[in-house]
């Protein structure tokens, strides 16, 4: 049984009735090559895959990830099959076109599919979860050589990417980052230091992992503006033979969390057992934070969508459970000892909780729709024969405005919705209570 529930009726209402996506966007470039019927069928396919993701979610929390003696990380076994399906069936559908900056899907529709996948199994979705922003970073800032080496591999998800900023002694204080990079020959750098809380930081789903590491080349200053972004592949691609060589990136421990145990949350060490080679993103020193702004915004979006997906599933599970769980008598017969038990959904306080959950879920989805709707509009305007730069800038600024608001508000509301879901469910029936 899947741990995930979704209502396609609600998602279709969001797309076709609230935002009228078919009328406003599917009739305009660059989204006029697919019909509403195509996207309705795509939602059905996404629900079927989300159901499989949901089945693996609870199993992955029980199995957890394990650090092996050889330094490799063992992830839940179900993830390998799911990863191959995700690559084969969904990467091209969800990803950006390799030759242009246009999205493969209208952002509004992409939101609904990501809500299903991230809500069904957020642990699995951390693997390869940084590829999308990594591709964007390389397109924006990478040198020709860096694009030739990394871009296609990341687009095909043959390799994956991770972002490495946090250090044990630093936390969120980037001025305390101590990872350093010393120049080598041929424009390369030797990186040394440790990073913690690196989600999906080591696994065998892909041939290679590219770490985007914040570190210092100039160690005489300790401001956040003296940080550089270094590309550190787990296995160094030999430019002559194409073979992948050990680049001395080690996982020294897996950090424990309350949940999301199927995600390999790693502590990584660079340069301890040998030289860890790196290249500087775009060959630009001390520009790491400026380069990584698009990454931060993508991470905020993902946080909001994960929260929405989990909250929506929690509400739907609660509504289903409340309709089946028999407890208490109808309020009109509370004093009648012979009165039958009724489903708890008939009790006023349970109705209040369910209505509150539904209202919060729809509010969160609607707020995210403001963001993705503005993004969809911006892409459509950019594809117009006569470009209205002022209008494009207006909608791009709206995206920037809504992004941190969505991250903060939706993640906070998701917590409250899931708290109410726990209250509705009460206790899990786990065997003979007598």
For each predicted feature, which ranges?
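Extended amphipathic alpha-helical segments enriched in small hydrophobics
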Residues: 300-384
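A short, Trp-centered hydrophobic/proline-enriched beta-strand micro-motif
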Residues: 156-165
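A short core secondary-structure module
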Residues: 188, 192-246
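A glycine-rich, basic-preceded beta-loop-alpha segment at the flavin cofactor/substrate interface
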Residues: 197, 236-252, 257, 267-299, ...
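Alpha-helix capping/hinge segments and adjacent helical runs
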Residues: 2-5, 183, 260, 393-434
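Amphipathic, small/basic residue-rich leader segments at the start of a protein or domain
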Residues: 1-126, 145, 149, 376, ...
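C-terminal helix-coil-helix/basic helical segment that borders enzyme active sites and/or dimer interfaces
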Residues: 362-409, 422-423
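N-terminal glycine-rich flavin-associated loop
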Residues: 126-144
